[in-house]
């Protein structure tokens, strides 16, 4: 398949630049992967769609304020977007400046040069930096960092984003983009779902900025997927096995939960074992033709045209059903992307 097969026209005004006043106030488009039928509703309908015995799998990563502004030794301005923390002092980052800083030079971080970091080496599009401070990278980011809103939101971050570009159940710092399907859940809705007899499990996938990188090849088979760190602990494996045994459904909240679970499934298939915990980097690329191993339903936002995520959804619901649902969403003025509306998708099984 070609990348252009996943194109759709999206009017600029349908890109959500701010969240709704309440988390659960978004709209929800239901899609049946077998029939292609769509149904319009509101996100609170999730309470009716989830059944007793189902398992919802959330990504509990926490978005870090990963964007810093500063300058080079020469005085030129730069912007640093942390992609991954290697340890408490070393990190990989995207660096934007008129000229790339050279290895061995210092960069000054913060509006008043509060901190400095040494440029250690370049790794493809990323730079390795070493913080020269008696604080950890996380502590420095909490002090001078900005929330790393996606490029299409196209505005400076605001104080409200510190809360709203974050799930209510976040636990483990490390993401530089939010697992956005989870943004629609508030504590009240979570309690109501639990009261129905559904169970919850938590994976961790630290979403990288690579999630916004465009696919630069025409043939999707030639695309090299970015790497992200994921954790699927033993308790998630146990919860999935118990859910399958009782006839419940595994409902992934977000594409990052899907990629975590399916990474664990693929690793176990490769090793010829039953489902095992997974801790490590994943470059899993899911596109039409992929056979899902674990996930039965998917809650997800609307994704960018020609992105790897619309390909993942197409593999889940069927290509034609997915593209038709997206056309329906555009025609009915759903809000798109991170702060936009959501879908509830039942997997295509026939």
Swiss-Prot record:
Keyword Ligase: no
Superkingdom of origin: Bacteria
Keyword annotations of the record: Cytoplasm, Queuosine biosynthesis, S-adenosyl-L-methionine, Transferase
Catalytic activity: 7-aminomethyl-7-carbaguanosine(34) in tRNA + S-adenosyl-L-methionine = epoxyqueuosine(34) in tRNA + adenine + L-methionine + 2 H(+)
Gene3D superfamilies the UniProt entry points to: QueA-like
EC annotation from Swiss-Prot or TrEMBL: 2.4.99.17
Similarity-based family: Belongs to the QueA family.
Function summary: Transfers and isomerizes the ribose moiety from AdoMet to the 7-aminomethyl group of 7-deazaguanine (preQ1-tRNA) to give epoxyqueuosine (oQ-tRNA).
Protein name: S-adenosylmethionine:tRNA ribosyltransferase-isomerase
